[in-house]
C-alpha cells in the first residue's frame, strides 16, 4: 500500500446490520473498482469515522459533524470504527461480498452466496467444491509427489478467475457495465505465463472453462480502444506487462482442439491484434 493508491472511497451505513461502499484504486490495475456489502449478525451500537487527509476545500456539507453516527463518509484516507453490544452474545459474524459493478451487485452476491448460511456451512461448501475439482485426478507416487501434483493442480484453478456478479454483470475493459450472455466472464490473464501449459491443460481437462476464458479474451478485444486481445489483463484493465503476442497461441490451440467453435470471431480478434504496433 502506498500514498495515493486510493483514488476515492465511500462507506455507508444502510442500517444497523448492513454496510455498503466502494474503493477505487490506482495500481497494477490502473483504475480498479471494488464495491462491497457487509452484513452483521448483531446490530451496530455506535460508530464513527475519521478522514486522515487534510482537505483544503470546506464545502457546505462540512457543517455536519460526521465524526460519529453519521451515515456516510467519502474520501481518500477514511477509516471507521464500529461498536457492538456483545454482553449477551460474544460472537459477531461478518459476511462480506464484493462486486466490480455496484453496491447493489455486491448485495445480490451476498444474498445469493451467503444468506442464511453459517460460517461452518460456507467453509464446508468450499471444501466440497475444491474436493469435487481435485478428485477428478487420481495418481500414484510418494506423498511428496502427490503433494506437488495436487498443489500444482490447485494453482491451475485459481487464475484466471471469475469476474462477474451472480446476474452476469461485469465491468469491461472500457469500464462500462456489460452482461455475460452464454458464458462466464474471466479476468487475470497473465498470458506470458499461462499460454505454454495452463491453457493447453484446461483444453484437455476443463474445455468448457477454457472456452469461457477465450470468449472473455475476445470480449476484451472488442472493448479495447486499441482492438487488442489481452496482454496482461486485470480487473477490467490492461496493464501491458510483458512484450509479445501470447494470446494468439491460446486462441489457436482452443480452435484446433475443437474447444472454441466461433472461429470467425476469434480470427477477427487475432487479425486486429496482429496489426497493432505493440
Model-derived regions, located:
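Alpha-helical support elements that line or immediately flank enzyme active sites
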Residues: 1, 151-164, 187-210, 252-258
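Beta-sandwich/jelly-roll carbohydrate-recognition scaffolds of carbohydrate-active enzymes
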Residues: 1-186, 219
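Short, hydrophobic/aromatic alpha-helical segments in well-folded domains
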Residues: 20-27, 196, 200-201, 213-216, ...
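Short, solvent-exposed loop/turn and secondary-structure capping segments
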Residues: 105-107, 162-169, 200-203, 211-214, ...
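Short acidic (Asp/Glu) and glycine-rich catalytic loops that position anionic groups and cofactors
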Residues: 106, 129-133, 193-194, 228-230, ...
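Inter-helical turn/loop segments and adjacent helix faces that build the functional surface
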Residues: 134-141, 204, 258-263
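Secondary-structure capping and boundary motifs in well-ordered enzyme cores
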Residues: 144-145, 184-193, 239-247
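Helix-terminus loop motifs that line ligand-binding clefts
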Residues: 170-174, 178-179, 209-259, 263, ...
Amino acid at each position: 500500500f502506498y500514498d495515493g493508491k486510493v483514488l476515492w472511497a465511500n462507506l455507508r451505513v444502510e442500517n444497523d446490520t448492513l454496510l455498503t461502499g466502494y474503493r477505487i484504486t490506482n495500481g497494477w490495475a490502473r483504475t480498479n473498482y471494488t464495491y462491497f456489502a457487509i452484513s452483521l449478525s448483531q446490530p451496530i451500537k455506535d460508530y464513527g469515522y475519521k478522514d486522515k487527509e487534510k482537505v483544503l476545500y470546506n464545502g457546505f456539507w462540512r457543517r455536519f459533524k460526521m465524526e460519529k453516527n453519521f451515515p456516510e463518509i467519502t474520501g481518500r484516507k477514511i477509516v471507521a470504527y464500529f461498536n457492538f453490544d456483545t454482553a449477551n452474545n460474544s460472537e459477531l459474524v461478518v459476511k462480506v461480498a464484493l462486486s466490480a459493478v455496484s453496491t447493489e451487485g455486491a448485495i445480490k452476491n451476498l444474498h445469493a452466496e451467503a444468506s442464511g448460511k453459517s460460517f461452518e456451512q460456507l467453509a464446508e461448501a468450499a471444501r466440497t467444491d475444491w474436493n469435487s475439482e481435485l478428485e477428478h485426478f487420481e495418481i500414484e507416487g510418494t506423498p511428496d509427489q502427490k503433494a506437488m501434483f495436487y498443489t500444482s493442480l490447485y494453482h491451475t484453478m485459481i487464475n484466471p478467475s471469475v469476474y462477474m456478479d451472480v446476474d452476469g454483470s461485469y465491468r469491461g475493459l472500457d469500464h462500462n457495465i456489460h452482461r455475460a450472455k452464454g458464458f462466464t466472464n474471466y479476468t487475470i490473464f497473465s498470458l506470458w505465463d499461462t499460454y505454454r501449459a495452463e491453457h493447453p491443460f484446461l483444453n484437455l481437462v476443463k474445455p468448457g472453462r477454457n472456452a469461457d476464458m477465450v470468449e472473455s479474451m475476445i470480449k476484451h478485444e472488442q472493448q479495447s480502444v486499441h482492438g487488442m486481445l489481452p496482454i496482461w489483463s486485470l480487473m477490467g484493465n490492461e496493464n501491458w506487462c510483458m512484450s509479445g503476442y501470447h494470446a494468439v497461441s491460446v486462441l489457436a490451440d482452443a480452435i484446433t482442439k475443437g474447444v472454441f467453435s466461433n472461429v470467425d470471431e476469434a480470427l477477427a480478434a487475432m487479425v486486429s491484434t496482429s496489426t497493432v504496433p505493440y
